Swiss-Prot record:
One of its GO terms (molecular function) is rRNA binding. This protein binds specifically to 23S rRNA; its binding is stimulated by other ribosomal proteins, e.g. L4, L17, and L20. It is important during the early stages of 50S assembly. It makes multiple contacts with different domains of the 23S rRNA in the assembled 50S subunit and ribosome. Part of the 50S ribosomal subunit. Belongs to the universal ribosomal protein uL22 family. Keywords: Ribonucleoprotein, Ribosomal protein, RNA-binding, rRNA-binding. GO terms for cellular component: cytosolic large ribosomal subunit. This is Large ribosomal subunit protein uL22. One of its GO terms (biological process) is translation.
């Protein structure tokens, strides 16, 4: 198996849909480009994904990988548990409010050097 580093953030108070909007912009990019893209996005989800990406970079550095040669091989957000709350409505009814959580996974790998 190739040399990879990963970071996982569980129970992020962020819906998976909003996390995926940011994640889709950086999938497959090298880490310098991904950090530049994330720093320009004015969303809470961008700050959270940026923090997980920096953690994955630190893990790669600890494993002795070349930081300048890393790219995001896999990144995805899955749905975590949901807190269900109820709010009263007219005529004795109530509606459910779902407070969503997500798990964010980031995998980094080194680019393969092509021999000519």
């Amino acid at each position: 198996m190739e040399n990879t580093a990963r970071a996982i953030l569980r129970y992020a108070h962020l819906s998976p849909y909003k996390a995926r909007q940011v994640i889709n912009l950086i999938r497959g990019k090298d880490i310098a480009t991904a950090l530049a893209i994330l720093s320009q996005i004015p969303k809470k989800s961008a700050r959270i994904v940026e923090k997980v990406l920096k953690s994955a970079i630190a893990n790669a550095e600890f494993k002795g990988m070349d930081i300048d040669n890393l790219y995001i091989s896999k990144i995805h957000a899955e749905e975590g548990p949901m807190l269900k709350r109820y709010t009263p409505k007219a005529h004795g009814r109530a509606t459910m409010i779902r407070r969503r959580f997500s798990h964010i996974y980031v995998y980094l790998a080194e680019k393969q050097q092509e021999d000519k």
